[in-house]
From Swiss-Prot:
Positions that bind Ca(2+): Y27, G29, G31
GO molecular function, one term: phospholipase A2 activity
Subunit structure, as described in the record: Dimer.
Enzyme Commission code: 3.1.1.4
Enzyme class: hydrolase
Protein name: Phospholipase A2 neuwieditoxin-2
Cofactor note: Binds 1 Ca(2+) ion.
Cofactor: Ca(2+)
UniProt family annotation: Belongs to the phospholipase A2 family. Group II subfamily. D49 sub-subfamily.
Family annotation (Pfam families): Phospholip_A2_1 (PF00068)
Record keyword Kinase present: no
SUPFAM superfamilies: Phospholipase A2, PLA2
Length: 40
């Protein structure tokens, strides 16, 4: 579930998943546009 995925991110990175990773990656976020953050 999404809850379990968020819990895994928190446990592995020690960061809250949504403020740090909510709009992460290529073309993520509202409207599906934006610049890639890194090679991930």
């Amino acid at each position: 579930s999404l809850f379990e995925f968020a819990k895994m991110i928190l446990e592995e990175t020690k960061r809250l998943p949504f403020p740090y990773y909510g709009a992460y990656g290529c073309y993520c976020g509202w409207g599906g546009q934006g610049q890639p953050k890194d090679a991930t």
